Regions:
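Short non-domain terminal segments
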Residues: 6-9, 35-36
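Positively charged n-region of N-terminal signal peptides that target proteins for export
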Residues: 1-5
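Aromatic- and Gly/Pro-enriched helix-to-coil junctions and flexible linker segments
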Residues: 20-137
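Bacterial N-terminal signal peptides
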Residues: 8-22
């Protein structure tokens, strides 16, 4: 009888953990689709790693990261992001350092690539539609 109780308890624990993990990943996807996700999670990454060269009055390579429209327009090499499709977003290719080994465009230049967590945050944001609040700059 005791082994049945222990087995049932273990099974229930496994089910609850699985439900909890699935809820967490769904919640993360939902959060990425909200304008607040950009303000709280994405903008700080851009401000720290990108804005010096691609924000404000600086638009190296023709890229301005300050608005969704400017990211959609992109720079001299085309659109920086394709909302809903991270695999077609040049911005992700560059911050992942996935270009050719001698590609000078890996971003940020002359620095290590962004952390996996930061790259995942930007990926989730693009996948969710790359929403930027209208008042954000």
């Amino acid at each position: 009888m005791r082994s049945v109780v222990v087995g049932f308890t273990g099974f229930c624990t496994l089910v609850l953990l699985t439900i909890g993990l699935n809820t967490t990943s769904v919640q993360a996807r939902e959060d990425a689709s909200k304008p607040e996700f950009y303000t709280a999670r994405v903008k700080p990454i851009f401000d720290t790693n990108c804005a010096r060269c691609h924000g404000g009055i600086n638009h190296r390579g023709g890229l301005n990261i300050d608005t969704r429209e400017s990211l959609l327009k992109g720079g001299h090499t085309g659109p920086a992001i394709v909302p809903g499709d991270p695999s077609k977003s040049l911005l992700l290719t560059l911050i992942r350092h996935e270009g050719p080994a001698n590609d000078p465009k890996n971003m940020p230049p002359n620095k290590s690539k962004l952390s996996d967590a930061d790259i995942q945050t930007v990926t989730d944001w693009i996948k969710a539609g790359a929403i930027i609040p209208a008042a954000s700059k």
